[in-house]
Structure formats: structure tokens, C-alpha cells
């Protein structure tokens, strides 16, 4: 191993020095590259799935919502807290709702070293059940996820980096980012498998390993990570290049390999929450006028057509498909930015929009929208994703490149007016008999060339 590292231009002394600077314990160095990670995922796809080892279930059960909330990562142990790069990394702890450990690594000059879990990285009560979890590299030990904190550099600070983060990976293959309004909201996933598919349970593969590229430049506004995806039906290797600029922009390069057939194979999925809005409140009993992280699905088709589909809380699970060929983009957007329309201190008016931009042709398929009934804001009940027309069968391989924009609005807005609200009511005229089965739609447009239109 020493000879291999020497060939890479890395000395054991330099790696040890980095371990001290990083503030965490690091394991032995091993060669790493994205190409090798892709081959690892390819090899795994030809082998039976092995579930990851987890910590003792009785201990995890005691780290419930309340106990988990008392466990805070000590920023003195943050990766890159003193550089290189602008953005330190902190970690989430395991618990009842996040049982699968994720193995974290630091990469420098082609060599990776694992970040060894230690309870001392976290501030927790003396009687916390988390203190009984195994340390080091024992089966079931590890972290649940991670966050990139805001810039540590004085002239770049948007907010105190020790208290504020801008991207988080936590649970299965879920991740999310704040937009330009400094607020978390909807989430993305590495992949979506058989969402709301009749007769089949949805599968949630995990990002089991993460590698953090050591930044080369203190002034860089981007970070690079690599992840390994593993599940009963799938494996995958992902590279994320994430830019902290106006909002957050992520360039994603992934290679995916299927172990089993998938009936609804969702690429670049976005997951959100919609309960009610001005469109229809239904039977929701709530003092607020609107409750949602997103209010519509926007599409820019391969032929250049713009489509806006308001979201709905349906009486039963609904699936809508918008057929297309080489789509230019789609996303779940939050267009209503008026606090008065929400009246809530959690600031739904600041939730980010998420736009998916393919960076190459995706061929034929459909943007599918899944809407699931909900009676509370705590449930994510909306999924939007690209589903290829060709069947996803065992042995299939996919190489995909796309960009995610976490902004207040879509990155390529139409010059025309856009729909910002849709209201439904009974048809007919006030004071007159209402015709049966007739609905009235009031659609509100804003901006663009609308002001120059004449009403006739």
C-alpha cells in the first residue's frame, strides 16, 4: 500500500497531518477514482444484495425523535473547518428514523481514508442511549448523513457557518438544498423505484458510502462528492459537483445498474409536500390559507412547449404522465411568494423550487407526477420524475448527466406571462340555478407580455 501511495505522490506523513487538521480519526488510505467506483457498482449488480449491517435495534429504538434532537455535532470536529475550501462538513447521528450507517471518506490526490465514527464528535446528554452504540469500524457503527455548512471565510459569509448549512444528505438516497431564500423545503433522491406501483412496494435504496473530495482552492464556490448506491434491485455510482452561488446548483453524473426488473423507474426524482392552497382546500381544517412546499409542476418539453400543472391533494393516489422526447427540463416549483397567503412562521413562501435540467438527450419517456392523499403537512405526498419509455429490466445500464437548480424560480423562465394561481368554483351565475357538474376555473397570470394584451 505504501508503494501505491508513493506512486500517487502521497506520503503517510502528509496523510497523518491531514488527519490532525481535519479534527477526526481517519482509517488507512486506499486508492480511489470515480471510474473505479463505477466498476465497483457494476460488479455489485451481478452479485446478490447484502443488506448493510445496522447497530443493535434496541439501542436505535431508544434514539427517538426527542433523543435524536438532543444530539448535536461538535463543529470543532468538522471536516475542512480550517480549510482547505470554504465549506466545512458536519455529520448526522444514527437514530430510530435513520438506522442505516453511511461510511464517510476523505479523498486527496487519488487516495481515500475513511472517517472513523466516534461518539466524542457529538455533544449529547450523559444518559443518551447513543453512547451505547459501537465506535470505530465495528458493524453497525457510522454516521446517518452529512451537511455542508455555509462559508467559513469572513468575506464570503452569508450566515454563521457553525449554525447554518446549505445542503444535506440524510436517509436512503434523499438529499436537499436551500434555495436563494435560505430555506429548506422539498427533497431530491438518487433514484425512485416503483413509486405508487400497484401490487409492488416502493423500494428505497441507500447511499451506503460517501467520498468528499479535498478542495484544491480556498476560494472555490463548489464542492465535489461521490456516492455509492445499493439496494435489492439496483446499484449505482454518483458524482455530485455542487455550487453555492445565487442558490444551489448541482451537476450530477451517474452510472446505474439494475439487479432486477423495475416497473416504474424514476430518474432525477423530486419529492415534495402539497396539502391545500387557494386552488382547493377540501376538508382540511386549518387556520392557514395555504400549506405546501410546492404548488405546481412546470415542464419545458423537447419541442419547446411550456406546461404548468397545479398540484392537488387527491381523494386517492393519482399518477399523471406527460409524454415527451428529450425534455429540456421540469421541476416542482413554489411560485406563491407572499407570506400573507401562508401566515406561518415556518415560511412556506421561502421554500425553494427545484428544476431538473438534462445535460444530454434522454430520449422518449414521460415526466410522471404522483400525488398521494394527505391530511397533514408532515407527509411528503408529491413525486415528480422522468420515466424512460424503454422497460427497465435486470441487467440494464444507464449513464446519465443532469443538473439540479435549487432556486426561488425556474432558471430559464418564459418571456410570456406565467400562471401563479388557479381557483376552482361552481359554474353558473350568482343568484341563478347552478348547472349540475359545471366547474368554474379562475386562472391568474403575472408578468411577461400579459400587460400588453387587450381584453375582448
Q: Model regions: which residues?
A:
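Solvent-exposed N-terminal domain segments of exported/luminal and surface proteins
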Residues: 42-198
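N-terminal export signals
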Residues: 1-17
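Terminal accessory/anchoring regions of large secretory-pathway or extracellular enzymes
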Residues: 19-65, 74, 341, 347-456
